[in-house]
Amino acid sequence: DPNDPSVIWLGTGENVGGRHVAYGDGVFKSENGGRSWKNMGLRKSEHISKIIVHPDNSDVVWVASQGPLWSSGGERGLYKTTDGGKNWKKVLGGGEWTGVTDILIDPRNPDRLYAATWQRHRTVAALMGGGPESGLHRSEDGGETWTKLKSGLPGSNKGKIGIAISPQKPDVLYAAIELERTKGAVYKSIDRGSSWKKMSNTVSGATGPHYYQELYASPHKFDRLYLMNVRILTSEDGGKTFVQLRERDKHSDNHSIAFRENDPNYLLVGTDAGIYESFDLAETWKYHKNLPITQFYKVAVNNAYPFYHIFGGTQDNGSAGGPSRTDERQGIRNAHWYKILGADGHQTATDPVYNDIVYGEFQQGVLHRVDLKTGEAVLIQPQPREGEKYERWNWDSPILVSPHKPERLFFASQRVWKSENRGDSWEPISGDLTRDEERLDLPIMGRRHGWDNSWDVKAMSNYNTITSISE
């Protein structure tokens, strides 16, 4: 709250379209600097993208909700309260698949708002990353009415849009727009969004623009932009050209950035690994290791004595293990945890006899057997025989150590595999147990779509796979 720093508004749920996205429980408010919190509603929003508090009236708050990813409906759109969160009114958005992914406020006029809508839907089979309801909008009356901004912008289906306003010249706006087939462009307006000019074909990449696309304008230099991406892209000329920001000794997958008003060399960046801080405009970075924010997919335990160890695969931070307890006076510390694999870690499994044997995997079933004594990690992923079709591995492929025979493993692609020697060799014990359907023939956004629509193929998980096994 710009009027009271002890008041904090918090939106829950990640604003991305990923298969591993975490959903939220609405909007929370703290009136004591974060010591305690109260849920203020919008529990069906699932993914809050941004919150803005009125600079002169703390009772007025705007909340941008992207809404559920896996289903229609929910509380999606732009919501406004005039009584500090007791009641909410939806002021923008109407489609059952369309939410608001970004909002801005004019620093000179709090009644002037800008909003970006995003139409998207993910199923187990596919991701439709855009649609005709994605776009840019402007309000001159605090969000009560809106005008869609079109002049100079592409008329095709659009995906995720990031918007920024120049602190030096607030009539100047910037927009990073995802277009079809994960292409995109950066646009600039010098007249409050009434007309736009294409500056470049720059768009976030890697797993897809749905995972990034946040755009920021520097408060210290006009036309300096930061576009969130695997590696941050920065422009000094309003989006005409972009270069990669220096990110030595820093994690990738960037999602947010903050600045200090009186320090042009300061950057604070949020990534898939946590928070990084720079005091010299990205020449060097400081990593804050003490935040308990690691996201685990699955966990497993071994039978180590006197304290068993816990192992788990994490989102974009590998697979790790650590003790359940310790007899050290300081208790369990970061240093007690150790990494056993990189990439996205997923399911882990342990050997009930040999506590130094752990199984872990990367995304798409890249299974390893790890010896904790030697540190050796051996790739043991089953492979198809000559002449067989390729294996379809789930993003989070299931691994099972038999409770009856510890050297026996089960692993699954579209078929079930069995090993009798801890993964040194494998035999398939089933055929294809899936329907082997064509994913793009299945309904999404409530109906079937043509092949030329806004499919985000790169961001889709392998389909027609087995997701769990038991014995």
Question: Regions from the language model: what does each represent?
Answer:
Residues D1-E471:
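Beta-propeller blade termini and top-face loops
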